[in-house]
Amino acid sequence: MSETVTQTETDQRPATARSLGAEEKEAKSDEQFQQERTIKGFRWFIVIISILSSVTLYSLDNTIVADIQPQIINTFDELDKLPWLSVAFLVACVATNSIWSKIYSQLNAKWLYLFCVVLFEVGSAMCGAAPTINTLIGGRALAGLGGAGLYVGVMTLLSVNTSKRERPMYIGMTGLTWGVGTVLGPIVGGGFAVSKVGWRWSFYINRECRPSVQPIRPLTVPPVFFAAVAIPIYLFMLPSFDPRPGVSYKERLAQLDYLGTILMIGACVSGVMAINFGGQIYPWDSGQTISCFVVSGVLFIVFGLQQWYCIGTTKENRTFPCQFLARPAFIILFVQTASVATVFFVPIYFVPLFFQFTRNDSAIDAGVRLLPLVCFIVAAMILNGALMSKFGYYMPWYLVGGCLSLVGSVLMYTIKLGTSTANIYGYMIILGVGGGMYAQASFAVAQGKARPREIPVATGFISLAQLTGGTIALAIANSVFLEKASAGIMAVVPDASKETVQSAISGASSSFFQTLDPDVREAVLAAVTHAISQVYILPITGAAMSISLAIFMPREKLFVASDSGDRDGVTPLGAMG
């Protein structure tokens, strides 16, 4: 028996031999994940507010570009590169998410998180000062790279600084800050787009800047507060967490999966490019689109083989946490998270678009229209975190949330040009409550089910699902909308060129709609509304998937006290895989 145990332990060790003292220190690191929170009182309040505020900046950057694209096109006059503004950010987020989670499992979470915050701020500054659209795209990629690390860092810091029982509540709070940033993104972006100072200040507000221009002084005070107050708090009040005490940095860096990292980045970049550019820049059957799909598919296959056979790495240090694929619990949580990301990302982008086209809303007014959706998403997230911590059951949240999301998505699909605003708000509320009930739940469930040292990796695993689901859903939704809207408009106005129609849809040429006769304009808007309604097939599919998977989730308690629980007072883990 002892020989078997020894062999198993040997197989799981990295290639570099570790001393017994280092192993003992790593065992102590495992205990740090499980112990009660050490920061108390007002200090904890300040720390948690500072950590959560960075989620606001990250979510703000996700949605701020939507309403300033026409101004960016007018500045640089390069419509063909417009998709890159979102693609660069999304590619950097998706491609590096798993990598960041592995790095967080090796290096000090506090200092790595600070590095990601700085990286994100530098990317935002680059966007604001960009002399060319290529520089702007590069800044978006850098901001996405830092933002992905920042988001994984927030979840990691919350997991290592809270007890298991209170963790769902604090993770639920990320929904509040995410919602604030999501709502402010279109509003702030639209406000700067129509102001004298211009769209560049939409990116400057994500970094420390001097409020020297009087018209935007009120909007620059909060970012100055974040940069001037939050970073010193991170430095002096946030406790350090070293996941591998006693292990040299040379050994830690040697254990990163560099080959897997390169393969994953290449596969993600080519895949996201194919989905985003297909039907927009290039036809779906063009050589460019097909080549991107083929390259992505080949690289994903090679990446899968490299991870499975541990080529150039070990089972313990693989970029992708393949061990979770052997646990049904984590597979279900991954798909659930990707599905709910589809449910709320699609309406967040297309609700403002609907009101801009059909109600002639300004960018600011269209952003405000999101309030019913986002407010109820946030409220449901907070309620989920509080009640799931108290009662422990998590399966009902997925089942009921999926059902409400399905109802809300179907209702959004039925919206026509003449549908009243009150009805649309009601549909959004149903959708928001449903999606919010389980939007962030998987983070807490996965962290509760993971082994102590797997918590950063489990966080990255669920974050990857969220980003992947949202990225693919938005890419497909954009392609469907552009294709359906272009075809519908050209059927009504056959003399219009495809380039003119696509420019009008993107917002770069509003004069196209103004020159149409009233009857023709109404027919065109009806075609646009029909195109927008088609994108809600994706949330319908995502909600249906959530309901189907929820049926197979166990009826277990995960976060509440039990007589046989561990020393944290939570039920034993692993009942679901």
From Swiss-Prot:
Q: How does it sit in the membrane?
A: Multi-pass membrane protein
Q: Quick one: where is this thing mainly located?
A: membrane
What InterPro entries does the entry give?
A: MFS (IPR011701), MFS_dom (IPR020846), MFS_trans_sf (IPR036259)
Q: Where is the composition biased (Basic and acidic residues)?
A: 21-31
Looking up SUPFAM superfamilies in the UniProt record yields: MFS general substrate transporter
Q: What induces it?
A: Expression is positively regulated by the pgm cluster-specific transcription factor pgmR.
Q: Can you tell me where the transmembrane regions are?
A: 45-65, 84-104, 111-131, 141-161, 174-194, 218-238, 259-279, 292-312, 330-350, 363-383, 395-415, 426-446, 457-477, 532-552
One term under GO cellular component: plasma membrane
How is loss of this gene reflected in the phenotype of the organism? Does not affect the production of the naphthoquinones derived pigments.
Q: Which residues are glycosylated?
A: 317, 360
Q: Name one Pfam family in it.
A: MFS_1
**PROSITE patterns (UniProt xref):** MFS
* Keywords tagged on the record: Glycoprotein, Membrane, Transmembrane, Transmembrane helix, Transport
Q: Which GO terms describe its molecular function?
A: transmembrane transporter activity
Superkingdom of source:
Eukaryota
The record's subcellular locations are: Membrane
What sections of the sequence does the record tag as coiled-coil?
A: none
Using the UniProt annotation, give all residue ranges assigned to the region (Disordered): 1-32
Q: PANTHER family under this entry?
A: MAJOR FACILITATOR SUPERFAMILY (PTHR23501), MAJOR FACILITATOR SUPERFAMILY (MFS) PROFILE DOMAIN-CONTAINING PROTEIN-RELATED (PTHR23501:SF12)
As for what it does, the entry says:
MFS-type transporter; part of the gene cluster that mediates the biosynthesis of pleosporalin A, ascomycone A, as well as a third cryptic naphthoquinone derived pigment, all responsible for the coloration of conidia. Seems not to be involved in pigment biosynthesis although its expression is regulated by the cluster-specific transcription factor pgmR.
Q: Which family does it belong to?
A: Belongs to the major facilitator superfamily. TCR/Tet family.
Write down what this protein is called. MFS-type transporter pgmG
